[in-house]
Amino acid sequence: FITRADSPLQFVHEIKDARLNVGPLQSGTAMSATTLYRQLFGTTSPEATTSYLSNEDALVKLTGDKSVDVVVVVAGQPAKLLADMKAEARGLIKLLRFDAEHPSSKAALGTYVRATVRAASYPNLLSEDLPGLAVQAYLVTYDYNRSATVSTMTRFARSLCQNFATLQAKGHPKWREVQLALPELKAGWRYYPPVQKELASCIA
């Protein structure tokens, strides 16, 4: 959650009634931003104060004509958009903190998880780590017991296991935070047995 450096806003739970940019329509960012807004405030983000610009265009509006108050960005850390910023950016923008103890945060933490926005990821923007939120990613498939589906998903899981160390060493830095463990899923969801078998043997 990005706002102007001189904004009185400090926390995510203070964005109600702010002019938000939530990313392009039907994008993952727009879905996450509008879901989080609804969970925080029990209502949808007002259409009159919600825009659907790209991150780059929204930042121009944020710091230029100031027709946007908050730009919501959902990206793997470090997000290139922020990591590439010059030191002067610190005088123009800042990131909002997520207060997990605030009463409005309880519903959000049923869907999203706590995260740390690291100063090391954005040295030109942050002087200290900030509490934030993370979106968990899932690969979802129909529970087809067809041989082609079983074969494809088994090969995918096996390849992930075999190449996991390479992904962590040479892939996007976010891979270093990924674990191959099989955490408990929310009610109504279960692991696809062929994938579960492969991953279980991989981490054994």
Residue ranges: model-predicted function:
Residues 126, 130-204:
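Segments of small-molecule ligand-sensing domains
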Residues 56-59, 80-81, 123-126:
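Glycine-rich, charged/polar anion/phosphate-binding loops
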Residues 1-61, 65:
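Bilobed "Venus flytrap"/periplasmic-binding protein-like clamshell domains
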Residues 34, 38-43, 64, 69-93, ...:
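A ligand-binding cleft/hinge motif common to bilobed small-molecule-binding domains
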Residues 17, 69, 135-137:
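Short, surface-exposed beta-edge/turn micro-motifs
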Residues 16-19, 110-115, 154-158:
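Short intrinsically disordered coil segments
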Residues 90-141:
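Periplasmic-binding protein-like
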Residues 4-7, 25, 75-77, 98-101, ...:
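Solvent-exposed coil/turn segments that connect beta secondary-structure elements
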